[in-house]
């Protein structure tokens, strides 16, 4: 499958295990604020419903969620001027990196990213230098396993999906960017336990890394970028060899 990489699986695990709780709350609150610009009612705002669902899954208190909605929709009178920004660069071994950020200060965010790249063997590039290597797509994660594969295939025949991956304790369903809402709704209606959903950048070509030291350097850079307060997501075309031993 195009864009498959062990980094994707590592990233999902680390997002749960390693994330600092306060930073996660701040990041998710910002996503809610941006989504709420299109309307404070989740029933008519799919982006807001998605952001709220992610926040609840991460344990964000209801009061924080309500406050973020009020700020973003202007009800609190102090709506933050946040904007989505995309940055691109290279890491060790020629790894392409795409970073999505949500910021109220582009200069600060760019400086933080540039420092993280330079300290970890990479460099921040110009807009467009690696974006062509990625495709923006939909992703729905189900609580399911290999035993459910036959029923899953039957469900996907009725939906706008074009692939899936079996992971430990989960199934990741892929589809076109514009199909996210219909895809997750359809899976719910087919009685699947939907864990999370969202858009992600799928690498169309990958950089294979077989050297443990290079692999560690790549992961160190990706972790450093993902740990920055303004960063929403980090995507890379890193493909780690299955037999690779990483401390």
UniProtKB/Swiss-Prot annotation:
Location(s) in or outside the cell: Cytoplasm
Molecular-function annotations in GO: DNA binding
Keyword vocabulary terms for this entry: Cytoplasm, DNA-binding, Transcription, Transcription regulation
Source domain of life: Bacteria
Pfam families: TACO1_YebC_N, Transcrip_reg
GO CC list: cytosol
Location, primary (coarse class): cytoplasm
Gene Ontology terms describing biological process: regulation of DNA-templated transcription
InterPro entries found in the cross-reference section: Integrase-like_N (IPR017856), TACO1_YebC-like_2nd/3rd_dom (IPR048300), TACO1_YebC_N (IPR049083), Transcrip_reg_TACO1-like (IPR002876), Transcrip_reg_TACO1-like_dom3 (IPR026564), YebC-like (IPR029072)
Leader sequence segment: none
Family: Belongs to the TACO1 family.
PANTHER family: TRANSCRIPTIONAL REGULATORY PROTEIN YEBC-RELATED (PTHR12532:SF6), TRANSLATIONAL ACTIVATOR OF CYTOCHROME C OXIDASE 1 (PTHR12532)
NCBIfam families membership: PRK00110.1, PRK12378.1, YebC/PmpR family DNA-binding transcriptional regulator
Protein name: Probable transcriptional regulatory protein Syncc9605_2132
UniProt organism field: Synechococcus sp. (strain CC9605)
């Amino acid at each position: 499958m195009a864009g498959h990489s062990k980094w994707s699986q590592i990233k999902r695990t680390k997002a749960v295990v390693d994330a600092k709780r306060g930073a996660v709350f701040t990041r998710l609150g910002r996503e809610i604020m941006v989504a709420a610009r299109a309307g404070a009612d989740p029933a008519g705002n799919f982006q807001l419903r998605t952001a709220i669902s992610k926040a609840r899954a991460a344990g964000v208190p209801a009061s924080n969620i309500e406050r973020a909605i009020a700020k973003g929709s202007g009800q609190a009178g102090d709506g933050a001027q946040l904007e989505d920004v995309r940055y691109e660069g290279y890491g060790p071994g020629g790894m392409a990196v795409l970073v999505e950020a949500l910021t109220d200060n582009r200069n600060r965010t760019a400086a933080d990213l540039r420092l993280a790249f330079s300290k970890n063997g990479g460099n921040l590039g110009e807009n467009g230098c690696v974006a062509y290597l990625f495709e923006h797509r939909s992703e729905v994660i189900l609580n399911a396993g290999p035993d459910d594969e036959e029923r899953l295939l039957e469900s996907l025949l009725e939906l706008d999906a074009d692939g899936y991956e079996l992971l430990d304790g989960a199934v990741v369903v892929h589809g076109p960017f514009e199909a996210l809402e219909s895809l997750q709704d359809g899976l719910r209606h087919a009685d699947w336990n939907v864990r999370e959903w969202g858009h992600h950048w799928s690498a169309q070509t990958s950089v294979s890394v077989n050297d443990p030291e290079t692999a560690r350097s790549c992961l160190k850079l990706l972790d450093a970028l993902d740990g920055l307060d303004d960063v929403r997501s980090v995507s890379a075309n890193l493909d780690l060899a299955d037999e690779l031993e990483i401390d």
